[in-house]
Amino acid sequence: MSSVAVIDYGMGNLHSIAKALQHAAPDVEVIVTSDAHAILAADRVVFPGVGAMRDCMQALGDLNLIDVVKEVANTKPLLGICLGMQAMLLDSQENGHTDCLGMFDGHVLKFAEPLENPNGEILKVPHMGWNQVKQTAHPLWKNIPDNSRFYFVHSYYAQVKNSSHIAGTSDYPNAFACALMKDNVFAVQFHPEKSQHVGLQLLANFLVWDGLLV
């Protein structure tokens, strides 16, 4: 039986993610843990997160998990979700400035306020609700139609320097990177565990992914 570890550092809707993973692939062992050995022993790892970036990095540091996450990123399939994706960039504007893990060359920026669509209507921040995702080819999009709608809740967004690392974009109102890819790492700004059948399909794809881009 293959296994997937969900990193528990005290910031994330872990129960919902674990339940969605179990539903997506009942034959996969789902382990919610902060134990470094258990994380490194798993076949795949999910790095979730909800909350403030400074708290995220502080919690990872307190649990001695920063190097663990970096090691996972070099050795096995890793899926970042929401704050977990943002933590993979160099730094974030949140809390003034917060250094992050640096897996992707880029920064986490706050949506400008007021935010207007082309019709002059004010868009709310945080960006909350369903939005379309335009895909770039990747195994985790298998059996998910392009422009499918996923569920978002965020006030900050990723801006990466290398466009080849962008696996998906969404508009609010301007295009922003909502999915990132690099070798065996895939990360999404949206919440697959809240995105109904397309979200479960993405999780199912991750749970059989070998970490290759083709």
Please report, for each region that a protein language model flagged, where it lies by residue.
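Short helix-loop-beta junction
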Residues: 20-28
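An anion/phosphate-binding loop that grips the pyrophosphate of nucleotide cofactors and donors
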Residues: 42
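Cysteine-nucleophile active-site neighborhood
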Residues: 51-127
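Amide-donor transfer/coupling interface in amidating biosynthetic enzymes
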Residues: 107-214
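Structural motif
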Residues: 46-48
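Structural alpha-helical scaffold elements that stabilize or flank donor/cofactor-binding regions
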Residues: 38-39, 72
